A protein has these predicted regions:
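Membrane-proximal, proline-rich intrinsically disordered regions
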Residues: 17-67
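Short N-terminal amphipathic alpha-helices
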Residues: 55-64, 74, 83-88
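Sec-dependent bacterial lipoprotein signal peptides
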Residues: 1-15
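Secretory-pathway/luminal and periplasmic proteins that interact with or process carbohydrate-rich
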Residues: 52-58, 72-73, 148-158
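Acidic helix-start/capping segments at beta-turn-to-alpha-helix junctions
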Residues: 64-71, 134-137
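Generic N-terminal helix/loop capping motif
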Residues: 11-14, 50, 54-57, 69, ...
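Conserved, well-structured interaction surfaces
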Residues: 41, 49, 80-156
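Intrinsically disordered, low-complexity regions of eukaryotic proteins
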Residues: 21, 67, 71-72, 79, ...
Length: 158
């Protein structure tokens, strides 16, 4: 009897196993994406788009021109942003300052690194994506990444 029970349990266990992988409907996996020249262009545009986010733009202004004599704080409202800007204006930046974070620039750097890593593979798959296209995309991503590193080093040093 034990022999029959173990055979039945083993057959049920084998039938219940499924070889398919469940993929999310709202996301694209790398294996399905990096196939065409247009998809590389989408990722290059995405890197530029992430550079234009409000977080990045606000920090570039605050880390750049705001610290010069050309811009000055005139608002006396007492909110978190004004307090953070007052700290920067007084060159007394605390670790809790909302502008003392660098994650948004590392998001841009990550997008550039992904393009630099995956774009060469597309040349082998899509003949319309030439070496000239790749070199153009590569140089843009290297320049954008270097700009982000420039701002990070200028403001946070090593």
């Amino acid at each position: 009897m034990k022999k029959y029970i173990s055979i039945i349990l083993a057959s049920i266990a084998m039938v219940s196993c499924v070889d398919t992988v469940l993929l999310p409907d709202d996301k694209t996996v790398d294996e399905d994406f990096w196939k065409t020249k247009d998809e590389v262009a989408q990722m290059v545009n995405g890197a530029y788009h992430s550079m234009l986010s409000a977080d990045v733009i606000n920090r570039l202004i605050v880390w750049g021109d705001f610290r010069s004599d050309e811009l000055k704080m005139v608002s006396i409202d007492a909110n978190a942003t004004v307090n953070a800007l007052t700290e920067i204006d007084a060159v007394n930046i605390q670790t809790t300052n909302t502008f003392a974070t660098w994650g948004c620039l590392y998001k841009v750097i990550n997008n550039c690194n992904i393009v630099l890593d995956k774009a060469p593979e597309v040349m082998e798959i899509d003949p319309s994506y030439t070496e000239g296209d790749y070199l153009t995309d590569r140089s843009q991503m290297l320049a954008l990444r270097a700009l982000c590193y420039f701002y990070l080093v200028r403001n946070f040093r090593d």
